[in-house]
Amino acid sequence: QNTLGPICANYIKAVYGSECFTCGKRCEGRDRQAGHFIPRTYSPVKYNEDNVRVQCSRCNEFYAGKPVEYERKLRLQIGDEAVENLKRESTKAWKWERQWLIDKILYYRQALKEREEAA
């Protein structure tokens, strides 16, 4: 998990750029974070791409992710059904299996490599 978190965050930042999902502010460097709709603590949707978007540190840390605004915008972007699915999946019992974590790390590494090669 220690390796997967940063790789997943880098992927989200590469895909969604530098605009904060919740407030629209341009964010760079340490101000640019991977913010989670469903909090990542003990959550099986922690590494689900639908659950993570770029957020500025102000929205993500000081306003606890702005959950109401996040959900409203996420519903517009991925649809009500996908948001409800995230909520359902987040309540399930989950144990991180080693092979699943390795597969996710490889997936994000390959996706980042392909994005870099395409740029």
Label every PLM stretch briefly.
Residues 64-119:
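A detector for short metal-coordination/catalytic motifs
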Residues 16-19, 30-40, 64-73:
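Phosphate-binding glycine-rich loops and adjacent basic patches that engage nucleotide phosphates
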Residues 1-19, 94-98:
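Short, charged surface segments at domain edges that flank catalytic/cofactor-binding sites
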